[in-house]
Amino acid sequence: VEEKEKVRLKTLLKGGRHEVTSRLDVPLYKRDGYKIPEDEVLLKNQNKVYLGNSLYHNIRYTYQYRNRLFWGFTAEKDAGEPFGSYGNKAYDAYSFHFLLKDCGKLKALALGDYRLGFGEGLVVNSDFSLGKSTLFNMGDTRPSIKKFSSTSETSFFRGIAAAFRFGRVDMSAFYSYLPTDATLRKDGTISSLKTDGLHRTLLELSKKHNVTEQSVGTD
């Protein structure tokens, strides 16, 4: 096994690359949902009237030192979502990630938002995809902990995950606490999960973070 070179803490924190990116989408047409209604109309058409403007905007900050240290945050507002109102603190969705890799016996430590792959993805896999390398990677049973920096509001864990190596033995553990959108029945049970991440109308906002997914595991 190739040992990673030792890196001083100061180099890890200051020797990497900072990057800030932003995206703004300005539509050239206007949907009926953006027309400003009276309060009575808004209440009667809770799923037809958008509460925010028609702009889409996100901003990202990332820091990376080689393949050893990553951190950053993402903030996003979808078109039609309110900005700084209706319970939103400015943007509708926020994400933070921190990932440290190959630090002695600690192979990976993730804080904030992350993705997992255990048991070739048959046990846990929040990072599944099909591609040219899928068959070549099937023999790799080592657990994977990856940073999550996407604007997607689903298919990730939020909390802490760590992987250690003691000789030829790998050990991993994780805990996640993730608020999730859902449609609830009158008795409080879940009717369905909402996975599109959109909170543009009163009805969509009423489904925001109604339930919490807690996950814990070891490998």
Where are these regions (language model features)?
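Outer-membrane beta-barrel channel domains
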Residues: 1-219
